[in-house]
């Protein structure tokens, strides 16, 4: 019996040895303590006291079970270090542009403020000159240039002031804009560059007709060529100027392409319109049809006005004298007034050589010769007014 007890005791002592060895399948290992949770939490123990039941700490910190081959202590340092490194990297990347932006913006502002700036000053007193404008704006900063715009009559009431520093220019604009100087409210604005456009050259001849800017009348090409056909004012009851029955012009304006012609007095629907009008048409380049020997007072063909004169005529034609060789011209853009009310006050200007433009050769008695002298005076006055003051030099702009 004693032997059996000793044998059993030895078996019990031998069996106790495996308890000290590592078990192949350990119990569940919990994650390392986080956020102040005590380390004893990993050991199996009862739940916390009832007063902590309201706090849901377990869902916030989920517990992951790891097999015994892997221990959480081996991976957590690498994971946490990777997270911290990546977090610091993103912070530095985000902070880089914020650090660089304040450095570039002040440099740009300083460059803009150091550039010169030009101001446009309008509605300034007309007696102001450059020193006056410089004195007005000089209190705000250094001025590079002052310019007041003038024409032949004096100041135009506006000018330009160029500051060396744009900040000074802005301050001057804010202070002086809208201020009253000698009863005039001046305006100060930033000067802008003017867009230069090429002005179209206006042809003085509009379909062969030239506009006189002084008198405001319209003259035909025959007037410049010396071939002027005056209306029969005697038939209309006008006694201001009366043309002779036939006039011969022996000279024309040099360089003008239209030929001179032996002229007859022209009559063109004056009884219908209240004034005499000469008859031309440029749209008829070919020779006109043969004349109809009717209505002897009418000289040139024109379908439009022939309808007014003839009324029921089937073919709107009227007589044309055979010796007339002048080309046909149009008055569709204006009217010819043989007697302008301003011409009696205009004397012929000898410097323009208008006396050589028309030489009259009277063919009849002394009465016709006197008529020719009157007509020559009128023509000289008309032609002198054409070249007198073609442009107004007192235009404001």
From Swiss-Prot:
Keyword rRNA-binding: no
InterPro entries on file: Fox-1_C_dom, FOX1_RRM, Nucleotide-bd_a/b_plait_sf, RBD_domain_sf, RBFOX1-3, RBFOX1-like, RRM_dom
Modified residues (Omega-N-methylarginine): 388
Organism listed in the record: Homo sapiens
Pfam families: Fox-1_C, RRM_1
Tissue: Predominantly expressed in muscle and brain.
Subunit structure: Binds to the C-terminus of ATXN2.
UniProt keywords, alphabetically: Cytoplasm, Methylation, mRNA processing, mRNA splicing, Nucleus, RNA-binding
Positions carrying Asymmetric dimethylarginine: 317
GO cellular component terms, semicolon-separated: cytoplasm; cytoplasmic stress granule; nuclear stress granule; nucleus; trans-Golgi network
A single BP term in Gene Ontology: RNA splicing
Listed result of changing residue 160 to A: Reduces RNA-binding affinity 30'000-fold
Effect of residue 126 to A/I/R: Reduces RNA-binding affinity 1500-fold
The protein, known as: RNA binding protein fox-1 homolog 1
Gene Ontology molecular function, alphabetical: mRNA binding; RNA binding
Lineage: superkingdom: Eukaryota
SUPFAM superfamilies on file: RNA-binding domain, RBD (SSF54928)
Gene: RBFOX1
Residues the record marks as site: Interaction with RNA: 118, 126-127, 151, 156, 160, 184, 194
Lineage: Eukaryota, Metazoa, Chordata, Craniata, Vertebrata
Gene3D superfamilies, A to Z: 3.30.70.330
Coiled-coil intervals, chain numbering: none
UniProt feature, compositional bias: Low complexity: 88-99
